[in-house]
Amino acid sequence: MNKLPLAKRAQILSLLCEGSSMRSIERIVGCSINTVDKLLRDAGEVALAYHDEQVRGVKAIRVQCDEIWSFVAVKQKNRVTSKRATDPTAGDCWTWTAIEAQSKLLISYLIGSRDAEYALMLMDDLRGRLANRVQLTTDGHKAYLQAVEEAFGADIDYSMLIKLYGEPPSSPEAPRRYSPSDCVGTRTEKITGNPDPKHVSTSYAERANLTMRMRCAGSPG
């Protein structure tokens, strides 16, 4: 069985990190797309295990949470009429992230639905990786309320940063927009403990999610 040289494996991973598609990597490196796919999966499993083992006992100060939308094969609204109508893995999916505001360390993350079950999974995982009480900021997604309470109880300083949106656009293109209406302001809501109002923010988490989206844009084959 042929084994890909280390230099080529490093080149493939480097190109993947730069956002190159698997098809383009196949052409550049001169290997099959199955090889690229297997290396991507293997590297992902190693990274997952490394993060799970090493990101423990984190002495964080402020943590910000956010979710980023994507879809598998077909958007949820089009799934019923698509060829993937009976595929339980198809449709909308969300990447949940919890980032430490000072170091920008991604403490916890998961992929799934944007519902209470996954909110609790994120908060339980976050709680298990922290070494101390932190200030937490999330957006206004209601699923966080019960999740934070169940995971942390009163041992947290928690605020929501709620965005206020204007009227939805009335142009013919409006139904095809991915994003909501323009944000016209924000308000904060203290939920638990004594969060510092000066540090109620999700800016770092949102910036990290934008970077994730841009770097992953070319990754599908």
Give residue ranges: language-model regions.
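Residue-level recognition of single "structural anchor" positions
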Residues: 1-221
